[in-house]
UniProtKB/Swiss-Prot annotation:
Cellular location(s): Mitochondrion intermembrane space
Residues that, per the record, bind heme c: 15, 18-19, 81
Keywords: Acetylation, Apoptosis, Electron transport, Heme, Iron, Metal-binding, Mitochondrion, Phosphoprotein, Respiratory chain, Transport
Gene Ontology cellular-component terms listed: mitochondrial intermembrane space
Function: Electron carrier protein. The oxidized form of the cytochrome c heme group can accept an electron from the heme group of the cytochrome c1 subunit of cytochrome reductase. Cytochrome c then transfers this electron to the cytochrome oxidase complex, the final protein carrier in the mitochondrial electron-transport chain.
Species assigned in the record: Otolemur garnettii (Small-eared galago)
Positions of modified residues (Phosphotyrosine): 49, 98
UniProt modified residues of type N6-acetyllysine: 73, 100
UniProt-recorded name of the protein: Cytochrome c
Length: 105
């Protein structure tokens, strides 16, 4: 069972320096993640993506995020995201549950 509060802590520690989740939130080094679930890679309006992100052509959901967040550069070679990933599956599940809630409010 995942834990949204743990997921929020992981987001604050590992993601928030580059991403926002609020509706209408600004892009930082990385795109605003509001509306992430069900969106195709490289599609946040107003953010400049690499061709690798635009051309990946997957839709973000629990399964794709689980794989991507383990090793972003392996999942999308050429991504600008300079993040090593979250290696522990339980932590990724917590983070994804937090993102599911936070990017949809």
């Amino acid at each position: 069972m995942s834990d949204i509060e743990k997921g929020k802590k992981i987001f604050v520690q590992k993601c928030a320096q580059c991403h926002t989740v609020d509706k209408g939130g600004k892009h930082k080094t990385g795109p605003n993640l509001h509306g992430l679930f069900g969106r195709k890679t490289g599609q946040a309006a107003g953010f400049s993506y690499t061709d690798a992100n635009k051309n990946k052509g997957i839709t973000w959901g629990e399964d794709t995020l689980m794989e991507y967040l383990e090793n972003p550069k392996k999942y999308i070679p050429g991504t600008k995201m300079i993040f090593a990933g979250v290696k522990k599956k339980g932590e990724r599940a917590d983070l994804i549950d937090y993102l599911k809630k936070a990017t949809n409010e």
